[in-house]
Amino acid sequence: MFDPHILDSPAVIFDNGSGLCKAGLSGEIGPRHVVSSVVGHPKFKTPLTGANQKKYFVGEEALHRHEVLQLHYPIERGLITGWEDMEKLWKHLFEWELGVKANDQPVLMTEPSLNPRETREKMAEVMFESFNVPAFYLSDQAVLALYASACVTGLVVDSGDGVTCTVPIFEGYSLPHAVTKLYVAGRDITEHLTRLLLASGRTFSCVLDKALVDDIKEKLCYVALEPDKELCRRPEEVLREYKLPDGNIVPIGDQLYQAPEALFSPEKLGIQNPGLSKMVSCSITKCDADIQKTLYGEIVLSGGTTLFQGLDDRLLRELEQLASKGTPIKITAPPDRWFSTWIGASIVTSLSSFKQMWVTSADFKEFGTSVIQRRCF
């Protein structure tokens, strides 16, 4: 029997990303736990440990043991592809990170724009049937990021680890026909930076593994306002120093702006798709002429890959050339944008009016998985 009072409990919020899963409780200012979206399974069974051997490891624990584990990434390019591992990840978040019982509190999960119907229904099925949650809701990541900026109409530029997308939103609803996606994001920029550093001829006293290159990227990379002019600058003007884990200092130059350039020029990675600025312009052009000006005036950045210094200035400069002459353009770059989707979810689930939005276990029992299509949009 469904108890309506359970909807008064703070909701559990999972923001599922290709690189990171963010978990926490409704009404809080940020996620309590941020875990790498990875599950590791032992490569070998060791007879000595026997029954005590863990069957799998999650997040950072898996990454630290990567030599003896087979690593699985259950979310690829924003979409869940490994369901068994995803369940393990959610179980870990409920029990070990948050320390809550899944059947005690409602659960809101975020989803990418254009999430396939079968994926949405499977998420609901797993939550209700495997975890016995009392109530569930699916919410678009871009819409939530816009809510975090106190807006209901605007265009969200969201770039995380696996996918970059531009999502126009009108009065709280995304406009699916105008969403554009680019499969160049944080992971690709890290890989590109690795290749550029190796090709630079510099010697590194440490192995350039993903964690190290991620750190270089996050600390030193930037988006050039005019990449052609950047190329003409004297080497000493662009050189930055990076301290390796062994204490050695290595100078790094042009690679620091060349790697993120792939967001604006995907052809650098052999991908024949429009770059970020053209994506925004294309998304807005596909919308009703009446709201195009409003969308240009409320562009919001979201996701960790939009944190590069100079990205907002470059985007603004290029959009001024693409938009109709005299169109006012405003780009908002919230400082906490790497988890603005989670913040938006925390805000929306705290509203008393949200209670009527939940899909309850009773609804699921009565209507089955299709209830998600009707109620979560």
Swiss-Prot record:
UniProt keyword list: Cytoplasm, Cytoskeleton
Keyword Thylakoid (UniProt): no
Primary localisation category: cytoplasm
Disulfide bond sites: none
Coiled-coil blocks: none
SMART domains: ACTIN
Record has Cytoplasm as a keyword: yes
Pfam families reported for this sequence: Actin
CDD domains: ASKHA_NBD_actin_Arp-T1-3
GO CC annotation terms, alphabetical: actin cytoskeleton; cytoplasm
Subcellular localization, as worded in the UniProt entry: Cytoplasm, Cytoskeleton
Family: Belongs to the actin family.
Name of the protein: Actin-related protein T2
Organism in which the protein naturally occurs: Bos taurus
Gene from which the chain derives: ACTRT2
